[in-house]
């Protein structure tokens, strides 16, 4: 159980939680790598991180804007795609810088994969999607299709019999 849910993020609780974390590569009971067959704490934490990647969705007069926090990521770490014709997928991975001459005394920044999916409205123009990442904030803009022209009523000629 994660003690942070109950406000138990004291130094002692944090230290105990780190002691309970078993690295993915270590063998668990019975020598299996999964540590008993259940999901690892890292997997669960990554899944939670994917679900809580902060995003704002705004409707503007001519477009929709999806604004997602991406601190520390470059354009090569972020992927923006459209799946199944109308599902916008924003994904990527934050990697830890590896240096052989450095020894971490504390590692608190979240590393790993993230993904968010958004169903686009019917009036979204799939051919006019752009993405810009500036100062750790990704903005994906999806332009709207022009509104359909109102149909003119069809006049039927009335014949006299």
Curated annotation (Swiss-Prot):
An example Gene Ontology molecular-function term: unfolded protein binding
A GO cellular-component term linked to this record: cytoplasm
UniProt-annotated location(s): Cytoplasm
GO-annotated biological processes: protein complex oligomerization; protein folding; response to heat; response to hydrogen peroxide; response to salt stress
Keywords attached to this entry: Cytoplasm, Stress response
InterPro entries: A-crystallin/Hsp20_dom (IPR002068), HSP20-like_chaperone (IPR008978), Small_HSP (IPR031107)
Record has Cytoplasm as a keyword: yes
PROSITE patterns in alphabetical order: SHSP (PS01031)
Record-annotated sHSP domain positions: 46-161
Highest taxon of source: Eukaryota
Pfam families given in the database record: HSP20
Family the entry assigns: Belongs to the small heat shock protein (HSP20) family.
Name of this protein: 17.5 kDa class II heat shock protein
């Amino acid at each position: 159980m994660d003690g942070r849910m109950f406000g138990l993020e004291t130094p002692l609780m944090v230290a105990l939680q780190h002691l309970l974390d078993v690295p993915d590569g270590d063998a668990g009971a019975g020598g299996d790598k999964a540590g008993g067959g259940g999901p690892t704490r890292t997997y669960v934490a990554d899944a939670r991180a994917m679900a809580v990647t902060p995003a704002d969705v705004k409707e503007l007069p001519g477009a929709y804007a999806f604004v997602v926090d991406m601190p520390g990521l470059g354009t090569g770490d972020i992927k923006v795609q459209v799946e199944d014709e109308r599902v916008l997928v924003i994904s990527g991975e934050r990697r830890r810088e590896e240096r052989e001459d450095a020894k971490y005394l504390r590692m608190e920044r979240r590393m790993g994969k993230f993904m968010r999916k958004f169903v686009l409205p019917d009036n979204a123009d799939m051919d006019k999607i752009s993405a810009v990442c500036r100062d750790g904030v990704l903005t994906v803009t999806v332009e709207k299709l022009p509104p359909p022209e109102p149909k003119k009523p069809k006049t039927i000629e009335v014949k006299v019999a």
